[in-house]
Curated annotation (Swiss-Prot):
This is E3 ubiquitin-protein ligase Fancl. Contains three UBC-type E2-like WD40 repeat-containing folds. The 2nd and 3rd of these form the UBC-RWD (also known as the double-RWD or DRWD) region. The UBC-RWD region may be involved in binding Fancd2 and FANCI. Zn(2+) 1 binds at C311, C314, H339, C342. InterPro entries: Fancl (IPR026848), FANCL_C (IPR026850), FANCL_d2 (IPR043898), FANCL_d3 (IPR044037), FANCL_d3_sf (IPR043003), FancL_WD-rpt_cont_dom (IPR019162), Znf_RING/FYVE/PHD (IPR013083). It catalyses: S-ubiquitinyl-[E2 ubiquitin-conjugating enzyme]-L-cysteine + [acceptor protein]-L-lysine = [E2 ubiquitin-conjugating enzyme]-L-cysteine + N(6)-ubiquitinyl-[acceptor protein]-L-lysine. It comes from the Eukaryota.
Length: 381
């Protein structure tokens, strides 16, 4: 028997104007708007023996009233399933009863005609809510994680998947006069941002990204291990100018940070524009690969359950904001491992008037060795 998710997936892929509801009795109710060529039909389909079609009741709006269709006045083939029924419905319903979109309204930019013209594309998924008040584009070709949500018919921006620094709402107001123009603008931005996402893709796949977690298409920062107790923080301030706005910070014990900063400086001066960021970083630090998660088979202890990874202050591994314990001191034998925010709060309770991890102050609360000022970068997201 088809689940509610199966029916919703079918409607999402082929009939974006329809929504389904499964009743506890097993019956299925499908309601909404079904489009075909220049014709829209508002309907309600009741299937008491879902997924079978026998006993169906179909209510179709004609003018201001709903007309009831059953097996008595609507011919169905015996082997039809729900998808066959909906596919053939525009052909088996009386054509003269179907309301059509006036051509003059089409020329003037009728929003529902625009939806009908756009929803058949295989390059994205189009969904409309039951009230026809919101439209969502998602699963774009080459950009599967991205989405655009607009209020209709006003085309007011509701949500999107681009970084927050992209002023999409302002761009839509200035440059998009109809639904197609809004969609084309968003897709153009995706193409313009391709280098931004491509540069992060190798890092996300080939490095052990610790922060942010979970990664989304809105994030402009990646923090991942360079070696034991040493981390790289990559930030791209302007997604439209990846290399020009890129910043790299090395985080870890003082001596290691000082040495690696010289390596970083030399590497940046010899940057290879033919390589992406990931390959340049490997070449810069003379590495074949960065530390990666353990992908081996066999039982592994979950990070949240691994006591060795937990913060020495809050005794948790990952905070609600996605932060993990990365702070350690210059003493390699010290057990200190904690979140930067936890250590900052701990120091605030002890030292009035002191600023955590400034040059003038920063000692390990366990062994009194020096705390590198580089860890302050963890607090500046």
């Amino acid at each position: 028997m088809e689940s509610n998710e199966d029916v919703e997936r079918l409607l999402c892929q082929k009939y974006p104007g329809l929504a389904a509801e499964l009743q506890p009795s097993g019956a299925c109710i499908i309601r909404g708007v079904l489009g075909s060529e220049d014709t829209w039909r508002r309907l309600k389909l009741y299937l008491p023996h879902h997924p079978a079609l026998h006993g169906f009741q179909l209510y179709v709006q004609e003018s201001l009233e709903y007309k009831l269709y059953t097996s008595a006045n609507l011919k169905l083939q015996d082997d039809w399933l729900l998808e066959d029924f909906l596919d053939h419905l525009p052909k088996i319903l009386p054509a003269q009863k179907a309301p059509t979109v006036p051509k003059e309204l089409c020329r003037e930019g009728n929003i529902y005609y625009d939806i009908l013209a756009l929803y058949k594309s295989n390059e994205y998924c189009l969904q409309v809510d039951e009230a026809c008040s919101m439209i969502r584009f998602s699963e774009f070709t080459d950009f599967e994680q991205h989405y655009l949500e607009l209020k209709i018919p006003s085309l007011l921006l509701l949500d999107h998947s681009l970084p927050d620094c992209v002023s999409l709402g302002e761009m839509l107001t200035k440059s998009a006069g109809n639904l197609e123009e809004a969609l084309n603008l968003f897709r153009k931005l995706l193409e313009d941002l391709r280098p931004f996402y491509d540069n992060f893709m190798d890092i996300d796949e080939l490095c052990h990204v610790l922060q942010p977690s979970p990664i989304s298409s809105k994030h402009k920062t990646r923090l991942f291990p360079l070696k034991d107790r040493v981390y790289l923080k990559l930030t791209i301030a302007d997604p439209f100018a990846c290399i020009a706005s890129m910043s790299l910070k090395i985080i870890g014990p003082t001596e290691e940070v000082a040495r690696l900063r010289h390596v970083l400086s030399d590497g940046l001066s010899n940057w290879d524009s033919e390589m992406n960021i990931h390959k340049n970083l490997l070449r810069m630090f003379d590495l074949c690969y960065f530390p990666m998660p353990d992908w081996s088979d066999g039982p592994k202890l979950d990070e949240e359950d691994n006591e060795e990874l937990r913060c020495n202050i809050c005794f948790a591994y990952r905070l609600d904001g996605g932060e993990v314990p990365l702070v350690s001191c210059d003493n390699a034998k010290c057990v200190l491992k904690c979140h930067a925010v936890c250590l900052e709060e701990w120091f605030k309770t002890l030292m009035d008037g002191k600023t955590f991890l400034e040059v003038s102050f920063g000692q390990c609360p366990f062994c009194k060795a020096k705390l590198s000022t580089s860890f302050a970068a963890l607090l500046n997201d």
